[in-house]
Amino acid sequence: YTKANPDNMILGSGTSDLIRLTFETVKPERTLIVGPTYSEYERMAKLAGSEVDKFMLQNLDDFELDVDMLMKRLNDTIDMLIICNPNNPTSKLISKGNLNTILDACLDHDIFVMIDEAYIEFVKDTELITAISLTKKYDNLIVLRSVSKFFAAPGIRFGYAITANTDFLEAAGNSKTPWNVNTFACIAGIMFEDEHYINLTKSLIQTERNLIYSAMSTRKTIKVFKPDANFILIKLLKEGQTAADVFDYCIQKGLMIRDCTDYEGLGNQYVRFCFLKPEQNDTMVNTILEIV
């Protein structure tokens, strides 16, 4: 499925288990996190005793990564860099070319890089974007994957990580929890062979992503950030309107969206929602456009 060397793979009880294992193995004193992003990275870093720095993506840049600015933050005091690609909640992607540039700089500064690809399979041309192939070139890289999002199986609790760093693989093998992959997850691995589901899901998400962005991007009272993943981030521009207002309105209509107020670097003007079936997406878009 990933075309990776099985000897370079680590299995875990979801990506949270693998994030914890990565911190326990690397033992970084200082971690740099590209944000706004998934809060679990910071929580795990602090549990591991690491200091945390942030490199915050900016609204004015449409939350696109400014690689040159990030490069200026990379130095010998940083032990670990964390990137979510595509990023949650911005739904923005970093190209493989830019990842190469970042990884080269991290090698120079002896920085270990963790790239979380929980949403990568929703991206167009995943095989051209994924950093898995880069693990053959960079031994300071680990790539995390999950079945929770693309395969819609969060309850299975199954994730996997890929790295060519033999020291990491040995240390992680010695410290990971025994029997950390349950029987149901082992059986569910057959889902990676379901080409019909994989191709159908990719096609559906790509079509709906384009339709949703087109339908919402012309509204002047919101700023819609062009998505690369299976969800979209929106900034509310109507004076006095908050994410809580839109969230409550959607709840009353039987719809669930994400109020992004608690994301550091966003605030109470941002909401996010995931793409569903076409008819559900139509309802979601129309409902949000009723209030914004």
Can you say where each PLM-predicted feature lies in the sequence?
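PLP-dependent enzyme catalytic core of the Aspartate aminotransferase-like
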Residues: 252-253, 262-292
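Conserved PLP-binding catalytic core of the aspartate aminotransferase-like
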Residues: 205-206, 219-253
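PLP-dependent aminotransferase-like
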Residues: 8, 24-83
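PLP-dependent aminotransferase class I/II
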Residues: 140-225
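Helix C-cap/helix->beta junction micro-motif
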Residues: 48, 108-109, 138, 219, ...
